[in-house]
A protein has these predicted regions:
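Flexible hinge/capping segments at coil-to-helix
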Residues: 23, 124-141
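Short loop->beta-strand "edge-of-pocket" segments that line small-molecule binding or catalytic clefts
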Residues: 30-36, 54, 133-148
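Hydrophobic/proline-rich hinge and linker segments of small-molecule sensing/allosteric domains
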Residues: 36-38, 109-131
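Ligand-binding cleft/hinge of the Venus flytrap
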Residues: 44-50, 61-70, 132-137, 151-167, ...
Length: 198
């Protein structure tokens, strides 16, 4: 059972505000402030050696700023406050934000640019123990998620019998699995593909 989700390219400043005046503000300041977590490989990653961001979303934002004739400023953000950073005008725009009804009440979203599946991950040695989604929905199982992500909400929905361990960023849910503190984690197929390769 794979669950597909859609990601809007950006969450924008509160749509109740005049979009034209928001654009005017960005153009007159000459800076597009972009909120990004820097922890979702390959979309947005912060290089600890250089303190610079890289990834698909970063490339898109650099091109958008170039097309607008402004500079881009990447603002560190956390998943649990990614939308409130927009509504409080800490930054103008954010990337790779899953559109949910709750988020759409307070922020505008562009069209979807990327689709992914939400998938569980377990250690290879435990594949026989957890061959299906249902095998993870058990009161003896601990599922790790990253606090504030759409995957955290989906873990509650998919695994109501399991113990959920929501990890505060910058720590990551998969690290709990590797350390033996969780039996599995739930993440995007995008990140899962990168983790399986590693």
């Amino acid at each position: 059972m794979k669950k597909l989700f859609l990601i809007a390219l950006f969450a924008l400043l509160p749509f109740s505000l005049n979009a034209e005046s928001n654009l005017d503000k960005i153009l007159s300041s000459g800076v597009l402030k972009v909120g990004t977590t820097g922890d979702w490989d390959p979309m947005t990653m912060k290089d600890p050696a250089t303190n610079k961001y890289k990834g698909f979303d970063i490339d898109v934002m650099n091109e958008l700023a170039k097309d607008m004739g402004v500079k881009v400023e990447f603002v560190p953000a956390e998943w649990k406050t990614i939308v409130s950073g927009i509504t409080s005008a800490r930054y103008d725009i954010s990337t790779s934000v899953t559109k949910t009804p709750k988020r759409a009440e307070v922020a505008g979203f562009t069209d979807t640019y990327y689709k992914y599946a939400t998938v569980p991950l377990v250690l290879k040695k435990n594949l026989k123990k957890f061959p299906t989604w249902d095998s993870l929905n058990n009161s003896k199982v601990t599922i790790a998620t990253t606090l504030g992500t759409s995957q955290e909400e989906k873990a509650k929905e998919f695994f109501p019998k399991s113990k959920l361990n929501s990890i505060e960023a910058p720590a990551r849910d998969f690290q709990e699995v590797l350390a033996g503190r969780a039996d599995g984690n739930i993440t995007s197929s995008t990140e899962a593909n990168k983790l399986v390769i590693k």
